[in-house]
Design a protein with these regions (language model features):
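Sec-dependent N-terminal signal peptides
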Residues: 3-11
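Non-catalytic beta-sheet/beta-sandwich ligand-binding modules that flank or precede catalytic cores
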Residues: 641-721
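Extracellular polysaccharide-degrading/modifying enzymes targeting complex plant/algal/animal polysaccharides
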Residues: 19-310, 314-338, 596-609, 621-633
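Low-complexity, Pro/Thr/Ser/Gly/Ala-rich linker/spacer regions in secreted
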Residues: 11-15, 620-649
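Right-handed parallel beta-helix
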Residues: 292-302, 312-325, 347-361, 370-384, ...
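Predominantly extracellular beta-rich ligand-binding scaffolds that present long acidic/polar faces
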Residues: 63-79, 478-584
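Short glycine/acidic-rich loop motifs that flank beta-strands on beta-rich extracellular proteins
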Residues: 64-66, 304-308, 325-333, 337-339, ...
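Extracellular beta-strand solenoid repeats
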Residues: 55, 66, 79-81, 89-91, ...
Length: 721
């Protein structure tokens, strides 16, 4: 019997490189060379397939790139990236070029025939007209004590009013200003022009609602979800009316079916006609749907963001996001989640080595599972924290087995900073200056169902009025692990553990509030039966929020801890140099060799036994946060793209010196937003040397051959024969 072996030879898939440039053309160019690029990234996306790369030449692009049902493959993704390290910007704003006229006093106005929901002057966000006043420049938008208003509701007097009503508390702020709603004589409930309240009436949740009725210091609104409304401190501010525009840097948009009227108070009495004013008109520059293996690399985004939906194994890497998201409250959209950077129903995705700065809304939300957010910088995130998904946090990851690693985060509004989903890993993060505009909250927050398998390790959590890391909920959570974290200068406990069978190992918590315990292993709410607390150091470790260890011993197994309640020592003196972030124990410290071996946790210890706390004397001095410098990489402030002047390839002068032709072959364009053919009047030329001079700096003609342009000029001077 003979056997025949049939061998099929499959040709490897060929990858293509496509090029996009401001000076390109979607109709006549094939996009396959730098000389014949496409004009838009969106067009390139329509012809790309697995393994293809779109190289984008330097410039500012205002477009929406839709990618639907176009998968890459493992090792052959669809890649969108810059060309040759040139700076590529996706801009979600447009210039406000219409004429401004004075409206009243310092307030100017103009009409526009499009909607905007964020205003910028010289690329800096301006404040939506509000009461009480606040500013971005001094971060007073985060100061709820002095620049928000307050309700009379207190936890000690919980029945003053119900959900859907708020009674204002008259008070004086730190600048001596009386915050009295009734004294303002506002018309908050004018039909179709109602004020919008940003209402923190749910402790760690905030909603925006239109004001339904108003008398004196009392107003009503459509109730928020009843099970989320809390009888704790209430705080709020108001937007949505022209009468709130009473300070420089504020703006208001009076929306209308055909023409919108835009009002603005320019700083220092300036004429807005002379300012660089732009408005946000776009939520997303990239919308990727049902397309796996799509990658965005080395791109910058101003006033716009990305959205991935059902797009597994996609990546965002080395990108700079400046003002990526904003609420549409100025368009009278209340109770609506802002369009934030989002990866939805997608798994095995990653966001790495990128910066997210100045958001209204969460920095990023992911759902799906096995997603990674690593080595990113987050700053000035969400000054309202309203109308968000779930717990309304700065970064939300849902699904299972996510990783949040090596990130730096500071100046954050939401009470809870990061939620990681079920069985998440949080490690090597540097988080501080958080929780400014809501009550309650923790920097790393784990609710009941998320706790089994969750690991929180090697983090720096500090300088915040919130909890550091918390296993929270109704007490049913279990089997979470916290180890080798350092927490300092907190206004609440560094560690809180509700539930049971948790493991709390080798943590250092110092410089706590004094009236709260540093490590809290709750006796109530789960009771912590089976929990193990071992090798930790803090001044106050207890089973109660504020009561002593002697009165409230830590439940479960408790041993080999340095607890100031027991020793009477101030543990902050036991480390080498806390001020310079050296949390290793002093060589003669009682912490050295005072711990006990925990398999998988203390394996690399030196000496006769592990040290107590997060660091080993003589061991690895690990650090937390990003491993790059945001100012070096992306700058400390936004800088607009400046297109370099074209370099002239050659010059041909007529024999009689009467004319000159200049040739160039460079990326040249005359406008980003209002494109038209290049004209002679778009150019100016100067020459030096010799006796000839230009009759005019403006060319007499411009001709094109492919991407080579020829400019013609008349000369004056003495002919050389």
């Amino acid at each position: 019997m003979k056997f025949f072996l049939l061998i099929l030879l499959l040709a490897p898939l060929k990858s293509e490189s496509y090029y996009v440039a401001i000076y390109g053309n979607n109709n006549t160019n094939d996009g396959k060379s730098i000389s014949y690029p496409f004009r838009t990234v969106a067009h390139a996306a329509t012809v790309m397939s697995a393994g293809d790369t779109c190289f984008i030449r330097g410039g500012t692009y205002h477009e929406i790139v839709n990618i639907t049902d176009n998968d890459g493959m493992d090792g052959m993704p669809l890649v969108f990236t810059r060309y040759n390290n040139e700076r590529v910007i996706f801009d979600g704003t447009v210039s406000i070029d219409s004429n401004w006229v004075q409206h009243a006093g310092n307030i100017w106005k103009t009409t526009i025939d499009f909607d905007i929901w964020q205003l910028f002057v010289d690329r800096e966000e301006q404040v939506m007209a509000r009461w009480p006043n606040a500013s971005f420049s001094d971060s007073s938008v985060f100061d709820t004590e002095n620049h928000w208003a307050h309700g009379t509701m207190k936890q000690s007097t919980p029945n003053i009013y119900g959900n859907g009503t708020l009674i204002h508390q008259v008070k004086t702020n730190d600048q001596g200003e009386l915050i009295d709603l009734s004294a303002q004589n506002f018309d908050l409930d004018e039909t179709n022009k109602e004020a919008i309240g940003i209402l923190n009436v749910g402790s760690f949740r905030t909603w925006s609602r239109k004001i339904n009725s108003h008398t004196g210091n009392t107003f009503t609104y459509d109730p928020v979800p009843q099970n989320e409304w809390k009888t704790k401190e209430h705080q709020y501010f108001l937007e949505g009316r022209l009468e709130f525009l009473d300070k420089e840097g504020e703006w208001f948009l009076d929306t209308a079916p055909t023409k919108n009227v835009l009002y603005y108070w320019a700083p220092s009495g300036q004429d807005p006609n002379k300012l660089n004013i732009r408005g946000k008109v776009q939520s997303y520059a990239f919308v990727v749907s049902k397309s796996d293996h799509v990658e965005l690399r080395n791109l910058e985004f101003f006033g716009t963001a990305f959205y991935f939906y059902k797009s597994n194994r996609s990546k965002v890497d080395q990108c700079n996001f400046y003002y990526p998201s904003s609420s549409k409250r100025m368009l009278r959209a209340s109770g609506q989640e802002p369009d934030v950077s989002k990866i939805k129903s997608s798994s095995y995705t990653s966001v790495t080595n990128s910066a997210f700065r100045f958001t209204d809304g969460s920095a990023i939300e992911t759902s799906g599972g096995n997603n990674v957010i690593k080595n990113n910088y987050f700053y000035h995130i969400d000054y309202t924290s309203s109308d968000l998904t779930g717990l309304m946090v700065s970064v939300l990851m849902s699904g299972k087995n996510n990783k949040f690693q090596n990130n730096t985060m500071h100046r954050l509004g939401a009470s809870a900073t990061v939620v990681g989903g079920d069985s998440a890993l949080f490690e090597y993060n540097n988080i501080y200056d958080t929780g400014h505009v809501q009550s309650d909250g923790a920097m790393i927050q784990c609710m009941t169902g998320a706790q089994p398998g969750t690991v929180i390790r090697y983090n720096w959590l500090h300088n915040s009025k919130k909890y550091g890391a918390r296993f929270d909920g109704n007490g049913a959570g279990n089997n979470g692990l916290m180890h080798h974290n350092v927490m300092w200068n907190l206004g609440n406990s560094g560690i809180m553990a509700k539930g049971y069978e948790h493991k709390i190992f080798n943590n250092t918590v110092i410089n706590g509030p004094g009236n709260k315990n540093d490590i809290l292993i709750m006796i109530g709410q789960g009771g912590n039966a089976g929990s193990i607390t071992r090798n930790n150091v803090a001044n106050r470790i207890s089973g109660h929020r504020s009561g002593s260890y002697q009165n409230y011993p830590v439940p479960g197994t408790y041993d080999h801890n340095e607890n100031g309640y027991e020793s009477g020592r101030d543990v902050s003196t036991l480390f080498i140099d806390v001020a310079n972030l050296d949390f290793r124990p002093n060589p003669d410290s009682v912490l050295v060799d005072a711990g006990t071996v925990i398999t998988g946790i203390t394996d690399s210890y030196s000496g006769s036994a592990p040290d107590i706390g997060a660091y080993e004397y003589g061991g690895d001095m690990w650090s937390a946060g990003i491993d790059w410098n945001v100012e070096t990489k992306f700058g400390s402030a936004w800088i607009d793209y400046v297109n370099p002047a074209p370099q002239i390839d050659s010059i041909v002068v007529a024999n009689n010196n009467t004319s000159l032709q200049a040739y160039f072959n460079e990326s040249v364009f005359n406008s980003i937003e209002n494109q038209s053919n290049l004209e002679a009047s778009d150019f100016a030329l100067s020459i030096s040397g010799g006796t000839a001079t230009l009759a005019s700096a403006t060319p007499t003609a411009i001709t094109q051959n492919g991407n080579t342009y020829t400019l013609s000029f008349n000369l004056s001077g003495t002919p050389d024969g």
